[in-house]
């Protein structure tokens, strides 16, 4: 209990020292800050999704992929990879908080936000430790079978709660895909940093992706991530672009870009 309170106090103190966050927290409240942070984190992850897909294209030429990974293995890129865990886990856990709020009537926002911040710190610290060790290994099939079962169970629980509501089908699929990704995306980031060779050695990456079960997992991730990301960007466009023609044009562009990246990702996964 004391550890949790000390952690909460440390996080709150750190955030209060950031002028921009502190100003809006005091004038608009923490829910406002959390909501905007969720959108910003989501947009960062969409940008990373595009970048990640682009880097994986070089798997068609293993020497080129290995050369790229040497650059991405530099100290600066390693720090950026670790920092990526912040928007990943924040967006993931806050999405879980929203699902609990909307569908399961858990309205104690103060407590939920404290858990959100505390668990985010724990995850980022754990990833940092694993990256520094760089010596861990696990059976890919066993790891992803466990995670897939957990993700599907969670997604089914959310689907059973939301499916009979009056919301649109697209809205429901956004929540269901979010529940699935709540497990799979943090798990993917952890898996890729258990050992440097897991994500940076072309031959090991290709060998893993040639397994039919891993292909199924990767394809599931691609479909869920692309849909969730596309819906999220469309929501931002709809909420903050008032000019109808411009909003429609952006929506079409978002759909086109997401379809292209989905096609590229699916084609790459199947062809390896």
Q: Which residues make up each language-model segment?
A:
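Membrane-embedded alpha-helical bundles that constitute the cytochrome b-like, heme-associated redox core
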Residues: 1-272
């Amino acid at each position: 209990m004391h550890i949790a309170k000390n952690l909460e106090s440390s996080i709150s103190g750190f955030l209060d020292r950031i002028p921009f966050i502190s100003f809006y927290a005091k004038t608009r409240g923490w829910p406002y800050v959390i909501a905007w942070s969720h959108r910003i984190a989501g947009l960062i992850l969409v940008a990373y999704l595009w970048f990640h897909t682009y880097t994986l294209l070089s798997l068609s030429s293993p020497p080129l992929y290995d050369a790229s990974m040497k650059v991405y293995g530099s100290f600066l890129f390693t720090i950026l990879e670790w920092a990526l865990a912040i928007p990943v886990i924040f967006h993931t856990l806050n999405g879980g908080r929203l699902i609990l709020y909307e569908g399961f009537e858990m309205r104690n926002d103060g407590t939920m936000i404290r858990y959100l911040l505390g668990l985010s710190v724990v995850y980022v610290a754990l990833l940092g430790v694993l990256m520094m060790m760089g010596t861990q290994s696990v059976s890919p099939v066993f790891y992803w079978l466990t995670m897939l079962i957990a993700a599907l169970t969670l997604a089914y629980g959310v689907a059973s709660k939301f499916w009979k509501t009056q919301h649109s089908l697209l809205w429901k699929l956004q929540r269901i895909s979010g529940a699935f990704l709540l497990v799979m995306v943090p798990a993917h980031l952890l898996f890729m940093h258990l050992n440097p060779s897991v994500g940076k050695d072309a031959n090991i990456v290709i060998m893993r992706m040639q397994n039919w079960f891993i292909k199924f997992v990767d394809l599931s991730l691609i479909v869920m991530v692309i849909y969730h990301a596309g819906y999220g960007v469309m929501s931002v466009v709809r909420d903050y672009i008032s000019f109808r023609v411009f909003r429609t044009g952006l929506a079409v562009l978002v759909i086109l870009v997401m379809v292209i990246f989905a096609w590229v990702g699916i084609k790459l996964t199947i062809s390896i």
